[in-house]
From Swiss-Prot:
Annotated GO CC locations: cytoplasm; Holliday junction helicase complex; Holliday junction resolvase complex
Region Domain I: start-end pairs: 1-64
Family the entry assigns: Belongs to the RuvA family.
Name of the featured protein: Holliday junction branch migration complex subunit RuvA
Chain intervals for the UniProt region annotation (Flexible linker): 144-154
MF (Gene Ontology): ATP binding; four-way junction DNA binding; four-way junction helicase activity
Source organism of this protein record: Acidiphilium cryptum (strain JF-5)
UniProt region (Domain II), positions on chain: 65-143
Subunit structure comment from the entry: Homotetramer. Forms an RuvA(8)-RuvB(12)-Holliday junction (HJ) complex. HJ DNA is sandwiched between 2 RuvA tetramers; dsDNA enters through RuvA and exits via RuvB. An RuvB hexamer assembles on each DNA strand where it exits the tetramer. Each RuvB hexamer is contacted by two RuvA subunits (via domain III) on 2 adjacent RuvB subunits; this complex drives branch migration. In the full resolvosome a probable DNA-RuvA(4)-RuvB(12)-RuvC(2) complex forms which resolves the HJ.
Subcellular locations according to the entry: Cytoplasm
Native organism taxonomy: Bacteria, Pseudomonadati, Pseudomonadota, Alphaproteobacteria, Acetobacterales
Amino acid sequence: MIGRLCGTAEQIEDGRCLIDVSGVGYVVFCSARSLAALPAPPARATLLVETQVREDAITLFGFIDAAERDWFRLLTTIQGVGAKVALNLLSALPPDQLASAIAASDRGAITRAPGVGPKLAARLISELRERIAAMPTGSAFIPTGTAPPVAPPQGKLADALSALVNLGYRRAEAEAALSAVQAEAGEDAALDELIRGGLRRLAR
């Protein structure tokens, strides 16, 4: 699994860029915000990366910072929000504005993103409003009186979860399996131990 690319930005096109790393060119799909933050080619560039593995393709999604990457991960847990729609949302609204729109139930702002209609905007607001406090820039936008959300997996657990989701497992199932593995193995369990244990449980 690729987590970061450091190389030369050779091309920047609509919705994607080409990063050369030691002679290998990686096509990376990005939000308009991340693409705008890249230097004019050819120039050194670094992107955080989420890897999506399917039977017919391996797709890379790049982010200029961890906040945008974490929001991409969160958005793609919502039914109806695939990678393309998540990037559209992050192109239309950077993380702080997206958090503000969700907290304020501002469907109009959210539907500015291509592919997001009123029903999907309502679902995003309903399912994410109490979860954004755990996200970068999110804590300032939580309405008073809401219950604190459960923090998402961090560190090695988050990396293991991302690996299992990229292999095609549903996020909720993968998270439950990894929680059980960590409970047995302890907080010091290595990343490969978490992944192998999660795979064993998911294969049952």
